[in-house]
Amino acid sequence: MKSRTRVVVIGGGIAGCSTLYHLTQEGWSDVVLVERNELTSGTTWHSAAQVTNFGMNQTMVGLKSHSIALFKALAENPEYPINYHHGDGGIRLANTPEQMQGYRHFASMARGMDVHFEVIDAAECARRHPLISTENLLGGLWDPLDGDIDPAQLCQALAYHARKAGAEVYRNTPVTALTQHKDDTWTVHTGHGDIDCDIVVNACGYRVNEVGAMMGVHHPVASMEHQYFLTEDIPEIVAAGQRMPLIRCPISDYYCRQEKNGLLIGFYEQACKTWGMDGIDPNFVNALCPDDVDRVMDVLEGAFARMPALRETGIRAIVNGPITYTIDGAPLIGPIPGKRNAFCAIGLRAGLGEGGGHGWLLAQMIVHGEACYDTWVIDPRRFTGHANVELTALKAVEDYQNEFRFHFPHEHRPAGRPAKTTPLTPVLAAEGAEFTVVNGWERVDYIKPAPDFHPTLGFTFDEAFDLIGAEVHAVQTAVGLAEVNGFNRIEITGADRHAFLDRMICGAVPKRAGRVGLCYLLNHHGRIKGEATVANLPASDRGPDRVWYGSAAASEFHDMDWLQSHLRADEDVHLRSLTNDQTILVLAGPRARDVLSSCARGDWSRAAFPWLSVRECFIGFAPATVMGVSFSGELAYEIHVPNAALYAAYLALRKAGAAHDLTLFGARAVDSMRMEKGFLHWKADLITEFDPFETGLSRFVKLDKGDFIGKQALLDRQGKDPVRKLVTLHVDTTHAPAHPGASLMQGQQVVGTVTSGGWGYRIGTNLAYAFVDPAMAAPGSSMMLDLCGDMVTAQVIASSPYDPDHARMRG
């Protein structure tokens, strides 16, 4: 066994084997995999092993598409062939118009990844799968490449090819401890000796937190018992002369695929069970949980109704084994929060079908720092301090119960709520607030007219449309107040704070006390890493000279990791998170200055407190820090208040605002207004696949300043054509917004992908942002938007169509 290697991958299931294989494909041959028992002895061995292209965003579709291509190549390789039923096809069933509408959106989205789904009616479903009844069925989504694979053979093939490329695999080698050294390298202690390495990867399946504990971290992963049945031969299958397509049914929560001349039927029952919450038997190897048929009988009845032939078929085997889930059902692939040189590939509820892509993207992250796709939807840092073991279990149960029910726009499911609140949460609830969830925080979405107001879930504009319009109108004509909680806030102190930020930020860094700037951070490839508001606060009784770095709520762990990883030992720079200590009250509208002047001492005139200023003050008697910034395009102030004084500040603002028709507003109104202004959302419009020039942010880049992260990559690309360009679109329909991922077409060619969409109430226009081919980026260019199957004209317009000179927000 080696005593020194570059990477140690812990875990010999699909995640570990795929990561090892793809590291060798990236040219790293000095890599090792250690497995406590035999390969595939955890969840992998009993996987139903379905392989589909279907995903709810382009990153997931892309990684699954890679899996399919990889598995097909492995199956055709005569050196180590494997059993892969490729191209059986699969149908996701639907019995509501909203489900069918969703499938049309996902087909539009997948087309941009060169993946082609087909939305079919009930009769066509039955034609393609002769066993199913069309009762209570509208249709489904057809994936022509759906199939299944032998999980053990797949992992052995990946390990075989990795070893051939120079990797080593140590079976029956349990990890007993992990030690990280001052230089951020690791020692992996095993039952057969120690291995020193640069990087550790946790790919331990349901034992993820046993290894996590060795690092001093908890991963938000929980295991669920999952059962499937194997039937005896079904005469209709024997007689069919063709393999049956796979079925996934959100109506009755089951899936089925052909297994020999029968079916494998798996269940996602409502009376589901977590597993391993109180620890896992160390001898649970190649093992299963006890059968519990009664628990799935209601689901089985639904399968009987859909496939009557099952009623005459016997069951030859029952499999009940643990599978892992995260808080949102997507895996955790990437850097482990708070740790250097540590990565994970965990929480893989659909590991076999996705595993080729998981290892592919993770290997790119390890070797190159980023993957070819923006991987935020699978990034481990998307969950923060609220993601404890109990909340994870609650969300795992909820996701399991809704396995085949996709999230609709503006749908926020109830389990594990409220996880994060402020003193204003119950106050705003009493005012009629409908809440959305942002990084666990309960944030006001809009104010509803009655407690029983529940808009229809779907892909069209919903019943809240006019309510949101009224909130926007109030902000435009008078003044509005919104709580924006969870906003990521990092305090940066030390003599070298500005030099540090100059190195991190691609543009000008505000350095004068009392001034604020919007800044962008790039990765080493010169592409968008982060967006931050940087405010310079002078020394006061509240603290020394300092910078407040503010960014999106979801970026809390991501941005702290990025900043900390670039601190130098010889720099006087200190970082401290204030995220959970402060909450923002946004005061916006033409009367905002009047309200602020009524409850805070001092001169708040435009001359004394211009746009992009920051000042400490009191709102009433509540200590606050006010910034003159706007995400709405109206005159606005961000009022940052310690949570202990938040209610006092709120009362003072409400009292002062009473004479000015102050109205509460929420996140959906903000989203409408920011689109009219050309303002972008992190991880919607600002992603790691594009640089600031492609994203329309050239004014925030200073190539003539000193070195900064990503500068050389930008210089290297000078003179080269951009891959895509971000544009603003007018969408010619009043029926529905453009949804992220939707494809833009020119004839049969995909020429762009939507990143954001919504109604602009102040200009009366349906708006969208999209990355499009550069040839289509000029104002006036017209293309067709595939909006849930309807082809709608979309025309490029100038960015910031509302008040393009920004006069209103300067006051």
Predicted regions and their residues:
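Glycine/proline-enriched, intrinsically flexible loops and inter-domain linkers
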Residues: 373-374, 379-811
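Flavin-dependent oxidoreductases
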Residues: 18, 177-289, 298-306, 385-412, ...
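Central beta-strand plus flanking loop segment that forms part of the substrate or channel wall
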Residues: 48-53, 89-92, 217-242, 298, ...
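C-terminal catalytic lobe of FAD-dependent flavoproteins
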Residues: 151, 251, 260, 282, ...
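Dinucleotide-binding Rossmann-like beta1-alpha1 core, especially the glycine-rich loop
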Residues: 48-128, 251-256, 261-262, 290, ...
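Flavin (FAD/FMN) cofactor-binding and adjacent substrate-gating region
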Residues: 70-73, 94-165, 170-171, 176-184, ...
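Glycine-rich FAD pyrophosphate-binding loop
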Residues: 24-44
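Beta1/beta-strand and adjacent pyrophosphate-binding region of the FAD-binding site
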Residues: 2-15, 32
